[in-house]
Amino acid sequence: MLFLMGVLALLLTTPNANADDKEKYKLFAEETRKEVWALKLPEFTNTAVQDKYKDESAVILAAHSRLEITKKTRFNVGAFLGGFHYIDREVNCRDLYRMLVQINDKAALKEFSEFDYKAEIRKKDWRYDENYQQVLGVRIIKPDGTVNEISTDEYMTATEGKKDQEQLQKLAVPGLEIGDKIDIFFFNYTSLENHNLDPF
């Protein structure tokens, strides 16, 4: 009876847990987009297309990338209280790639009108915890200079994998037309934590 009650409780709480995960990711994505769009990058302000590139399907007008890696090592107090000597090692990686692209024809329009990517992946066992999150940011710059940021509400979310550990997002970019510029970035955050026995 207790087992059945436990299973029922798990079934009742799982949807709420999934909903919480989606909400946490949404907030993370919103904060990431604010941070990236606020970066002072002069190369993204000069959006003129040189005449020699006007017949190209798409022209990359600016590109920016950065990679940040941090490492932490700490003693696992919880494991110590249980009679084990564990050292936790955590590595965090933040990887950003952003580019500004001029859309000149239908082929380029098709290529940059839809995106499909894995937004979040979680893996965990007794040896390690791994979390991966990816955020897509898109802005459309019209020929008159008007900037339209694609709302978070336009991103469609789904889950797959064992225990819904993989969160997918899809985006059909609304309002993108030939002659527009698309300002786009991918931000990848990876956190890996290893649990190792202290060799002493």
Language model: regions and residue ranges:
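Charged, amphipathic alpha-helical interaction segments
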Residues: 11-14, 104
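Beta-strand-rich, non-transmembrane domain signature
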Residues: 20-200
